[in-house]
């Protein structure tokens, strides 16, 4: 039996694409193992899938000054030795890396063990982890056509992003039932990313009366961001984080407000959900979400509101515009030729398996 080690972590966006590949890889006869961080979000998600999980030391890679920049390289080095030992013992035929700081030691360790590595970059420009890992990769899968020029060494392959099959098979009635909605108001789904967004949470709750006058709200607000005072608010259902329920909640929604991570926007495109994107600002990120959002806005798939312009008035104006023009966005998304990347990526994995 062929064996693959997968890696990726830090946020759900570095894990869920891996899950999308699992059923197809199993169908192709691969035994799957996973290397991730000790305390990252990926551990719980992967172990729940029944996949053997190997935790390693990992340091965060930062583009800014922080005292931890002096200690974290030693954590990465420790992670390389741990990953090298795991890889030597498990003897995988190939490694698949989805990005996130935990993947750098795994990719280096695979290279030292002469194991081929396929990486995947979701955003238009590569994150720091993938930039550091690229020299040790055999191929780097990319989601956007614009990304090819940003990957050095002629290693880029345009594959699209992998989307979980079950996400496309949600049940609208189950989603509505889960939220306890009793009327026929359109449903607005708000996603702040797997770690939540205090800015989005705050402005939504500040304008709750206004929004609830037109919509029922499903609010996925992130860990420790629930508001107990809103538990029994009619038309408002809040969740810290959802996994199995997400397909049903997506199916039930008519509009979506979201950050602009590549994975989630491609899921919205696949589901043809009219969406308002609020990308992370340049101040609090490397600007990848701004580029992602601009690409989708240019294609007519999304409406965009910059975080710096996020105010009560602008939020309501954009939301109303999106709802009034929802069919225009649905039609634009219906014309998209973007593929689900599962088949493209698994074909590449097959090709380079030792």
Swiss-Prot record:
Any GO BP: regulation of cell shape
Keyword Transcription in record: no
Signal peptide: none
Pfam families attached to this UniProt entry: Glyco_tran_28_C, Glyco_transf_28
Membrane topology, as annotated: Peripheral membrane protein
UniProt KW Cell division keyword: yes
Pathway assigned in UniProt: Cell wall biogenesis; peptidoglycan biosynthesis
EC numbers for this chain: 2.4.1.227
Cysteines engaged in disulfide bonds, as pairs: none
Keywords carried by this UniProt record: Cell cycle, Cell division, Cell membrane, Cell shape, Cell wall biogenesis/degradation, Glycosyltransferase, Membrane, Peptidoglycan synthesis, Transferase
Source domain of life: Bacteria
Binding-site residues for UDP-N-acetyl-alpha-D-glucosamine, renumbered to this chain: 11-13, 164, 194, 289
Catalyzed reactions: di-trans,octa-cis-undecaprenyl diphospho-N-acetyl-alpha-D-muramoyl-L-alanyl-D-glutamyl-meso-2,6-diaminopimeloyl-D-alanyl-D-alanine + UDP-N-acetyl-alpha-D-glucosamine = di-trans,octa-cis-undecaprenyl diphospho-[N-acetyl-alpha-D-glucosaminyl-(1->4)]-N-acetyl-alpha-D-muramoyl-L-alanyl-D-glutamyl-meso-2,6-diaminopimeloyl-D-alanyl-D-alanine + UDP + H(+)
GO CC field: plasma membrane
Enzyme class: transferase
Subcellular location: Cell membrane
Gene3D superfamilies assigned: Glycogen Phosphorylase B
NCBIfam families: murG, PRK12446.1
Family, similarity comment: Belongs to the glycosyltransferase 28 family. MurG subfamily.
UniProt-recorded name of the protein: UDP-N-acetylglucosamine--N-acetylmuramyl-(pentapeptide) pyrophosphoryl-undecaprenol N-acetylglucosamine transferase
């Amino acid at each position: 039996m062929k064996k693959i080690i997968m890696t990726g972590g830090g946020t759900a966006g570095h894990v869920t694409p891996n899950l999308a590949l699992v059923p197809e890889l199993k169908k192709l006869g691969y035994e799957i193992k996973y290397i991730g961080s000790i305390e990252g979000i990926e551990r719980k998600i992967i172990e729940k899938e029944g996949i053997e999980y190997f935790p390693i030391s990992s340091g965060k890679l930062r583009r800014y000054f922080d005292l931890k920049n002096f200690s974290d390289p030693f954590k990465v080095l420790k992670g390389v030795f741990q990953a090298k030992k795991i890889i030597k013992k498990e003897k995988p035929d190939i490694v698949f890396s989805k990005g996130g700081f935990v993947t750098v030691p795994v990719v280096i360790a695979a290279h030292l063990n002469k194991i081929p590595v396929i990486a995947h970059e979701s955003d238009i420009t590569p994150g720091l982890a993938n930039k550091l890992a690229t020299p040790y990769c055999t191929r780097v899968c990319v989601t956007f056509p614009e990304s090819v020029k940003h990957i050095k060494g002629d290693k880029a392959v345009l594959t699209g992003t992998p989307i979980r099959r079950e996400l496309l098979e949600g049940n609208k009635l189950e989603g509505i039932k889960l939220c306890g909605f009793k009327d026929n108001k359109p449903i607005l789904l708000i996603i702040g990313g797997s770690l939540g967004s205090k800015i989005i949470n705050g402005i939504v709750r500040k304008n709750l009366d206004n929004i609830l006058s037109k919509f029922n709200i499903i609010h996925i607000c992130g860990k420790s961001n629930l508001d107990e005072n809103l538990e029994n608010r009619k038309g408002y259902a809040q969740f810290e984080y959802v996994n199995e329920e997400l397909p049903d909640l997506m199916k039930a929604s008519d509009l979506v407000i979201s950050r602009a991570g590549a994975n989630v926007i491609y899921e919205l495109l696949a589901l043809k959900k009219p969406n308002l994107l609020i990308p992370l600002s340049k101040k609090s990120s490397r600007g990848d979400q701004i580029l992602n959002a601009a690409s989708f806005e240019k294609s007519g798939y999304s409406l965009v509101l910059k975080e710096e312009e996020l105010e009560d008035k602008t939020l309501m104006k954009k939301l109303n515009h999106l709802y009034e023009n929802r069919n225009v966005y649905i039609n634009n998304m219906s014309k998209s030729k973007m593929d689900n990347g599962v088949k493209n990526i698994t074909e590449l994995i097959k090709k380079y398996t030792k």
